[in-house]
From Swiss-Prot:
Belongs to the SNTX/VTX toxin family. SMART domains: PRY (SM00589), SPRY (SM00449). GO terms for biological process: killing of cells of another organism. It comes from Synanceia verrucosa. This is Neoverrucotoxin subunit alpha. Expressed by the venom gland. It is found in: Secreted. CDD domains: SPRY_PRY_SNTX (cd16040). Heterodimer of alpha and beta subunits. The modification N-acetylserine is found at residue 2.
Length: 703
């Protein structure tokens, strides 16, 4: 082949008279075929000033090549790694990281001057060197068009697949406005509110032949930079760079030169394009999976995807290296195009085939989707994600954790035979081992409707437990992934006092409140309380971080005025308004009323209306020295017989949804039911206390 060639410079430092090897797409710097005098004598220049902008809406290699004016032959050389690009051409290497990500590129192109070598072949003497004698070059540069390119690459955040096209269209509409925005006006002023919102969430990456003081990273930056580009080429285009070059076969000037024997056919170029485009697409899917927020919290699956990503990256480099090795040989006529076809065919028959890798990623993506469906149910609760068994052990062994419930993804596997097959194939492509590990969606737990449904049911059960014990100080809640073949999908582990009690937890059915005998059964619901300083009466003192209260006859406390303060009775509420199921214990002595009240209870009335137990918004159990124990509501009171008079520890269990408030005498790990109020609570209730009456003193400690 002896035709002239025209190609984009792609940021490479071309000069007139420079030699070029089209077989290897290699510049040969440091030598000119013509001497300086000859170049000066036959060089001509023509002004060719122009500028244009273009929107590139696709991130495909084909679209990028078109934007850079790259023909098929040079394109396959770039894909094969033969061409090292620079300047604006680095845009070719900028690919989307994620599949579900919208990308729109704004291209600005300006040309300044065209220089050419005008001497006809055979009329000038050429300089011979070892380069020309050994046939290391095929062409010589005889024309260069100067100018500059700039590419503003705008990316959205990851979006849902269903919104991708909509976001893409809106991005194109906004970015098309950039060249029309006046330099005096702010970009935001000339956009609609919806467009402003969209533009503010776009990131920008700049690739250009212009020397900028700072690179644009936002839409606003891009608008400002775009307006300044025409001024950055300098006077008479002094800062312009080679954009397009014209090459003439070296044989026209030097008869002993080698020729480019054959070029790669367009159909073969397309197949190579397709193959590499498939690889990049699969890589983006892996990126998307690996960077998922949930995946990063689960080392079992993250490490597996990361391992695949590294293996696949190595394979891509291997394919590119093979293409780079074969292209010069095919162009020189040493090998046929079949050697390139073999690379494509070998991949199709290998574990790295598009079908195999796509199926494996499909399983991974489905697995992630199922995990997220369950994790999404737990999100927003107080459950904590832990990454592995060691971290889980550290949490369940914490001093304040009596019980721990852990929602465990049990079917996330650490080892994947397919990854071993891929790794082995990279080491030994001719090996036939591993055929049985071809990926498949059959018999995968994440594709089983039964398994997924059961996982969601368990996740809902777990969430119910979290909500039931939301304020419990004794129960910790965790989520993790631990491989366990006994359970498909997920299970709930129960740890008690730091030890695993069961891997398939079912909360014991609640007995009637009178049926509780063991204190440990109620401690599931134990909550932390503190006295509210804004409600406490001035004749009651507080200490021990607001957990101990005592009546102080004749000792007025210096509390500031507050509208919530009880003025007439030695009463105090706790800070915590409670709904749900809660249990707390107090250590009491003397005259003490213990119960709950609505926040609306009167604070100022100098009569029984503001006394707890003497109205319709409070319920109490009382210890009255020399008289015994009573339960009191709305001024009605009844004496209660207790098994051990003088007991010092009282337990209170609130089942707000069920409308019950129960009191227990506590001794070691046993409780004895004393009384239960039944009602319908209509608002949160606050633990309430009255300490001392007349000459009787009273103290309460929150345990």
């Amino acid at each position: 082949m002896s035709s002239d060639l025209v190609m984009p410079a792609l940021g490479r430092p071309f000069t007139l008279g420079m030699l070029y090897d089209t077989r290897r797409e290699k510049l040969i710097p440091g030598f000119s075929l013509f001497g300086d005098e000859t170049l000066q004598q036959y060089q001509s220049s023509n002004t060719q000033r122009s500028s244009e902008f273009k929107i590139v809406a696709s991130d495909s290699t084909e679209s990028k090549s078109s934007a850079m004016d790259i023909e098929a032959s040079l394109g396959v050389s770039f894909l094969g790694g033969l061409v090292e690009v620079g300047g604006s051409a680095k845009y070719l290497n900028n690919t989307k990281k994620y599949q579900n990500q919208s990308r729109v590129t704004l291209k600005y192109k300006a040309t300044t001057i065209y220089k050419q070598f005008t001497a006809p072949p055979g009329t000038v003497k050429v300089q011979e060197t070892v380069i020309t004698q050994r046939g290391l070059a095929t062409h010589v540069v005889t024309g260069i068009l100067y100018g500059a390119n700039a590419f503003f690459v705008f990316d959205s955040d990851k979006v849902e697949d269903t919104n991708l096209q909509d976001i893409q269209g809106k991005m194109e509409a906004v970015i098309k406005k950039i060249p029309t925005i006046s330099i005096e006006g702010s970009a935001s002023v000339q956009l609609t509110d919806e467009e402003k919102s969209l533009a503010s969430n776009l990131s920008c990456k700049f690739h250009g032949d212009f020397l900028l003081e700072s690179l644009p990273t936002t839409f606003e930056d891009a608008v400002t930079t775009y307006q300044t580009l025409p001024t950055l080429l300098g006077e008479d285009g002094a800062s312009a760079v080679p954009m397009k070059v014209w090459l003439v076969p070296l044989k026209k000037f030097f008869s002993k030169a080698k020729l480019l024997t054959q070029e790669i056919t367009v159909s073969k170029v397309r197949r190579i394009h397709t193959t590499l485009e498939e690889l990049y697409k699969l890589k983006r899917r892996a990126n998307e999976a690996m960077d998922d927020k949930l995946v990063q919290q689960i080392p079992l699956i993250h490490d597996k995807i990361s391992n695949f990503h590294q293996i696949f990256q190595d394979y891509m480099l291997t394919v590119q290296k093979k293409i780079a090795e074969k292209l010069p040989l095919v162009r020189a006529g040493t090998e046929s195009e079949q050697s390139l076809q073999k690379i494509i065919d070998d991949r199709a028959k290998s574990p790295f085939s598009n079908e195999n890798v796509s199926t494996w990623l499909e399983v991974i993506e489905r697995e992630i989707a199922v995990l997220k469906s369950c994790a999404g149910m737990v999100e927003g609760t107080q459950a904590k994600f832990v990454s592995n068994q060691t971290e889980l052990d550290r949490e369940v062994l914490a001093e304040d954790v009596k019980h721990a419930l852990c929602f465990v993804f049990t079917s996330v596997e650490r080892n994947d035979p397919y990854l071993k097959v891929l790794s082995d194939y990279l080491e030994s492509p001719d090996s036939k081992d591993g055929k049985e590990a071809v990926p498949s969606t059959e018999d995968k737990w994440c594709f089983s409707t039964r398994v997924v449904l059961k996982m969601k049911q368990r996740a809902q059960t777990f969430c119910d437990h979290v909500n039931d014990f939301e304020k419990s100080r004794n129960v910790g809640f965790f989520v993790t992934a631990l491989e366990n073949g006994k359970f498909q999908g997920a299970s709930i582990y129960h740890y008690k006092d730091g030890s695993l009690a069961t891997q398939d937890f079912t909360f014991p059915r609640m007995p009637f409140v009178q049926g509780y005998k063991k204190r440990s059964d109620l401690l599931w619901y134990a909550c932390d309380l503190t006295f509210d300083r804004n409600t406490i009466n001035i004749w009651v003192s507080l200490s021990d971080n607001d957990t101990f209260a005592a009546s102080e006859h004749g000792k007025r406390q210096n509390y500031p005025k507050h509208p919530e303060r009880f003025l007439c009775y030695n009463q105090v509420l706790c800070n915590e308004g409670l709904t749900g199921k809660h249990y707390w214990e107090v250590e009491w002595n003397g005259y003490v009323d213990v119960g709950v009240a609505y926040i609306s209870i009167s604070r100022k009335e100098d009569n029984w209306v503001s006394a707890i137990g003497h109205n319709t918004c409070s319920w109490v159990f009382s210890s009255i020295p020399r008289a015994g124990y009573v339960e009191r509501y709305n001024q009605r009171q009844y004496y209660v017989t207790v098994p051990t008079p003088g007991f010092k520890q009282l337990g209170v269990f609130l089942n707000w949804p069920d409308g019950s408030l129960s009191f227990y005498a506590v001794s070691s790990d046993e409780v004895h039911h004393l009384h239960t109020f039944k009602t319908k609570f209509t608002e949160p209730v606050y633990p309430a206390f009255c300490l001392g009456y007349r000459f009787d003193h009273g103290t309460v400690r929150l345990l």
